[in-house]
């Protein structure tokens, strides 16, 4: 099974679009899109990881 990841190197960003591209985080929370997810990853100091693309 290949590990999936998201490149969050350009984050955090002050504002995210309302684009709907759900990402499920390791905290079992569904983030609306990559921007929302990556901002949360930065806030978590890297402890939050990607579980899967799509809703949890």
Curated annotation (Swiss-Prot):
Top-rank taxon: Eukaryota
Compartments where found: Secreted
Cystine pairs: 8-38, 16-35, 24-56
GO cellular component, one term: extracellular region
Notes concerning its domains: Avian ovomucoid consists of three homologous, tandem Kazal family inhibitory domains.
InterPro entries the UniProt entry points to: Kazal-type_SerProtInhib (IPR050159), Kazal_dom (IPR002350), Kazal_dom_sf (IPR036058), Prot_inh_Kazal-m (IPR001239)
Assigned keywords, A-Z: Disulfide bond, Glycoprotein, Protease inhibitor, Repeat, Secreted, Serine protease inhibitor
Domain Kazal-like: 6-56
Site (Reactive bond 3): 18-19
Keyword hit for Protease: no
Residue positions the entry lists as glycosylated: 45
An annotated Gene Ontology molecular function: serine-type endopeptidase inhibitor activity
Protein's UniProt name: Ovomucoid
Name of a matching Pfam family: Kazal_1
The keyword Cell inner membrane is assigned to this record: no
